[in-house]
Amino acid sequence: MKKTFLLSVLASGCLTLSTQALSEQAPFAIAIHGGAGTIEKAKFTPEQEKAYRAKLAEAVEAGYSVLEKGGESLDAITTAIEVLEQSPYFNAGRGAVYTYDGSHELDASIMDGRNRQAGAIAGVKHIESPIQLARLVMDNSVHVMLSGQGAEEFAKEQGVALIENNIFDTKHRYEALIKAKQKLEKEKATSKNYQAAHKALPANYKMGTVGAVALDKNGNLAAGTSTGGMTAKRFGRIGDSPVIGAGTFAENDSCAVSATGHGEYFIRYSVASDICARVKYQNKTIEQAGDEVINQVLAPIGGTGGVIIVDAKGHICMPFNTSGMYRASKSNTQATFVGIFKNQ
């Protein structure tokens, strides 16, 4: 018993010393998400849950490694998001959902908290890493948002290779498209209206995004978001992910936010910038601001989803009003956290 107690004290002392030493550094932190929605433990096999957790951990560790070495927050979030874009598990890049016509249209945005510089792309079909192209728009163009064919022409000028759209094809996303179209036809037969039919689709068909927010050792915040959009979307629909202030926002004076959810609501309520404004002008904590917008503003009107937030002190908050949100975080004072379901 005494031996066990001594080991516990020694272990505790080491942890305390380690935390004290870490807290003396300039704070740095990163949080990521892989989308919010009807994500329930009963729907996962142990192997599936393990695979999702491993990919989330890989992404957050990749971004954290950049920060730990003194790298910029912009590089950290780009690195983390690229890991998620390369995974078929999440609705971005290789895991992008299908449009109604059976193709893939990708959106992304990024924002620099130092100066509010931002870049975004929407409706691209042949870009392997949308977040990288959004970064190039921010760094190498005089514009903020480029779309469709024009965005891809810009990509070619920047030396980005265009790829075939079918590289984003996955069996599980195609099966989801078929189910969505069947539901749409059934609802349309009743309503005689595509818009009304699409509104009646379950929330999971309307959500799915990846994103990251980070604070680096120099005190600079950044946020980025990437998505394949909404299953069975039509007419060139664009959601909140590439919209600065809705799906992405970062400002050193307040916080950095990346959102995931039913994009139309997040656009209408300027979710990302609203959270930052409450922090900046009302002196709210990110916990207060995030809870107010996600649970008090959006939830009552049917706006489902969540956000990840980091502030200038390295505090992290990840509120959501759905049954789950793929998420992970790490800071110089917090060990790696990975969560999927509520109450984790």
Each language-model region and where it sits:
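Short, Lys/Arg-enriched, disordered terminal segments
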Residues: 1-5, 20-23
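Sec-dependent N-terminal signal peptides
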Residues: 4-13
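N-terminal signal peptide c-region/cleavage motif recognized by signal peptidases
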Residues: 16-18
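Alpha/propeptide regions of enzymes that mature by internal proteolysis
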Residues: 22-344
